[in-house]
């Protein structure tokens, strides 16, 4: 798949994964249109990081969409009455940081935007190996959403579908960090923490997964 001179809408949250996708697209000489969401999340600092990444890569356009999912909550990221789990990553359990329907909503908005500007791809930083168990970050979800997207708009019906591009889907977080460096992503400017503090808490799932991967990458790098 070549991205050179193609238009791509990237869901840019400001985190490690979406910033890496942006870096890969930039290095591939794609025309990047960034889309971020102010959805009532407690970690709004990610929006600042998203804007920094957008400027760093000098993308074509960057939009922040206001879409308040805190109106009905259902997640510790959008409901401050719920505590973010800090006891460590648990396997085979979907944590309460899962936001009901978030990726489905975000990708749907991105699909509308992509069709409106005649973009060829939607770039997603979803990752199936080191994720926290979210149902909307898995390969079967991406496959089914692509099938839906092909039916849901004019381009799809005319056999020129907008494709979901998920370059990180089968990578572990250590591999993503390596890819981030090779694509000139300023990792110090990205934001992964869920807790909403001015500095990363180091205890939430997102911090733990990122920090563990960084230590592995650092150790492996020092051995070379």
UniProtKB/Swiss-Prot annotation:
- What are the binding positions for ATP in this chain? 12-22
- PANTHER family hit by this protein: 7-CYANO-7-DEAZAGUANINE SYNTHASE
**GO molecular function terms attached to this record:** ATP binding; ligase activity, forming carbon-nitrogen bonds; zinc ion binding
A single GO BP: queuosine biosynthetic process
Q: What does this protein do?
A: Catalyzes the ATP-dependent conversion of 7-carboxy-7-deazaguanine (CDG) to 7-cyano-7-deazaguanine (preQ(0)).
Q: What is this protein called?
A: 7-cyano-7-deazaguanine synthase
- The lineage's top-level taxon is Bacteria
Q: Which reactions appear under catalytic activity for this entry?
A: 7-carboxy-7-deazaguanine + NH4(+) + ATP = 7-cyano-7-deazaguanine + ADP + phosphate + H2O + H(+)
Q: Which InterPro entries match?
A: QueC (IPR018317), Rossmann-like_a/b/a_fold (IPR014729)
| Entry's EC annotation | 6.3.4.20
Q: Which Gene3D superfamilies match?
A: HUPs (3.40.50.620)
In the record, the note on similarity to other proteins reads:
Belongs to the QueC family.
CDD domains for this protein: QueC-like
What NCBIfam families does its record include?
A: 7-cyano-7-deazaguanine synthase QueC
Q: Which cofactor does it need?
A: Zn(2+)
Q: Which residues bind Zn(2+)?
A: 193, 201, 204, 207
Class of this enzyme: ligase
Disulfide linkages recorded for this protein, renumbered to the chain, are none
- Describe cofactor binding as the record notes it: Binds 1 zinc ion per subunit.
Gene it is expressed from: queC
Sorted keywords for this record are: ATP-binding, Ligase, Metal-binding, Nucleotide-binding, Queuosine biosynthesis, Zinc
State the organism named in the record: Prochlorococcus marinus (strain MIT 9215)
Instruction: Tell me the pathway.
Output: Purine metabolism; 7-cyano-7-deazaguanine biosynthesis
């Amino acid at each position: 798949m070549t991205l050179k001179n193609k238009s791509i809408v990237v869901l840019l949250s400001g985190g490690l994964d979406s910033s890496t996708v942006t870096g890969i697209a930039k290095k591939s000489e794609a025309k990047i249109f960034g889309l971020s969401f102010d959805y009532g999340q407690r970690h709004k600092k990610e929006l600042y990081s998203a804007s920094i990444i957008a400027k760093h890569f000098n993308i074509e356009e960057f939009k922040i969409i206001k879409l308040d999912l805190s109106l009905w909550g259902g997640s510790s990221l959008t409901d401050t009455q719920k505590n973010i789990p800090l006891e460590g990553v648990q396997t085979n359990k979907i944590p309460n940081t899962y936001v009901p329907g978030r990726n489905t909503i975000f990708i749907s908005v991105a699909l509308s935007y992509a069709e409106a500007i005649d973009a060829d791809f939607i770039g997603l930083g979803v990752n199936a190996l080191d994720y926290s168990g979210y149902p909307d970050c898995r390969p079967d979800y991406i496959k089914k959403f692509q099938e839906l997207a092909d039916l849901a708009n004019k381009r799809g019906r005319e056999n020129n579908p907008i494709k979901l591009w998920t370059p990180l889907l089968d990578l572990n977080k250590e591999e993503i960090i390596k890819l981030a460096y090779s694509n000139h992503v300023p990792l110090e400017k990205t934001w992964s923490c869920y807790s909403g503090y001015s500095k990363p808490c180091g205890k939430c799932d997102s911090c733990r997964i990122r920090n563990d991967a960084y230590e592995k990458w650092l150790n492996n790098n020092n051995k070379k």
